Amino acid sequence: MKSLHCVGLYLLSLLCQLTEAKKHCWYFEGLYPTYYICRAYEDCCGSRCCVRALSIQRLWYFWFLLMMGVLFCCGAGFFIRRRMYPPLLVDEPTFNVSYTRQPAGPPGGPQQPVMPYYSDPGGAMGNPMTPSFYVQPNSPQGNPPFPPPPSYCNTPPPPYEQVVKSYK
């Protein structure tokens, strides 16, 4: 009975070996080829050695694509960051434009101190080319006190013929 068990196991192992897919490999040793066998999930490497087919070191294209993906993501992130947060402009225009008129103070009275509004973190004092804008400190935010407009603003312009005659 024991021998029948042993023969059965031996035949089963032979059947498993026959059904298992194998790779037949060969290499030249001198002038003659030498043959050897590797398992189905292994590759032949040359001189009677077998290596696993899916070893991560042999997948050069995987590493290449991984590095290209990392570079692409870094480049895209840099581009998006530059578009969403553009760099601060250092060069200011060389001309000085006054956007508000200074209110006329009382003729004999002391002038109120004027607080400068800085257009950049360095301020107008740090950069001589930076125009400074002045705001009255004690005025409401959106309604600074200005003098009334000149009287000629309330009248219609003179006719064209009158202007031409006055210059002749």
Swiss-Prot record:
The keyword Membrane applies. May be involved in the transcriptional activity of NFKB1. May regulate WWOX role as tumor suppressor. GO terms for cellular component: cytoplasmic vesicle membrane; late endosome membrane; lysosomal membrane; organelle membrane. It is a single-pass type I membrane protein; Single-pass membrane protein. Residues 142-160 have a biased composition (Pro residues). The chain crosses the membrane at residues 60-80. Its main location: membrane. This is WW domain binding protein VOPP1. It is found in: Cytoplasmic vesicle membrane; Late endosome membrane; Lysosome membrane. Keywords: Cytoplasmic vesicle, Endosome, Lysosome, Membrane, Signal, Transcription, Transcription regulation, Transmembrane, Transmembrane helix. Disulfide bonds: none annotated. Residues 130-168 are annotated as: Disordered.
